[in-house]
Amino acid sequence: VLSELPRTALAVRHFQGREVRCPVPADGELLLRVLYIPLDAASRAWMQGATYRPGLVAGEVMAGLGLAEVVESRSASFQPGDLVCAETGWQTFAVVPAAGLIRLPRLEPLTHLLSVYGVAGLTAYFGLLECARPVQGETLAVSAAAGAVGSIVGQIARIRGCRTVGIAGGASKCAWLVRELGFDAALDYKTGTLADDLRRTCQIGR
């Protein structure tokens, strides 16, 4: 559980493990065994108050998505062994409504269901292709390019024929963007010359 709302940096004291009786699903519900949870930056924002969801409350299970396996089903739409992504919170077992959930394929590795095919991947895909709508040949600068969303944005942009310039903190992250992910260039914002570097690399004003 989230035992205390943090006012500064997160620490072990803000969380507490508890053992409780395993919940029992009612009609239309599923008992899930949580396999993986993502540690997203959004989780920290929820601790600071209401965002796109209500703020968290101390003493309750830490909120969050979970990739889970159905243990017991009280819904005709799911069977034990099915995989789903649901609002499970940070716990080993959770009971959730079956309505609105979809059965997921068993990919390898399973963690891709929470990353590339999860919220980060969907945010990158629709944010880039439906909102930004870059055109082939354009230069696209990606902030937080070494993060979950930014790293996927850059790769999709490259596939769509854009020149991609990533912005990240530190030489190692910048090297990873270029060598491993195929970014055309990467800028280290920690150098203190980001504005000049961005103008030069993206040829702004030419």
Located regions from the model:
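Short polar catalytic/cofactor-binding loops
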Residues: 2-8, 37-39
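Short, glycine/acidic-enriched capping/hinge loops at junctions between secondary-structure elements
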Residues: 10-12, 43-47, 148
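A glycine-rich helix->loop->beta "capping" turn
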Residues: 201-206
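Glycine-rich beta-strand-centered segment in the early N-terminal region that forms part
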Residues: 21-39, 47-90
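Short glycine/threonine/proline-enriched tight-turn/helix- or strand-capping micro-motif at secondary-structure
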Residues: 9-21, 50
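NAD(P)H dinucleotide-binding glycine-rich loop of Rossmann-like/cofactor-binding domains
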Residues: 62-69, 80-144
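Short, hydrophobic beta-strand segments that form beta-sheet elements in well-ordered domains
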Residues: 1, 70, 81-84, 164-168
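Mid-domain Rossmann-like dinucleotide-binding core that forms the NAD(H)/NADP(H) cofactor-binding site
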Residues: 118-197
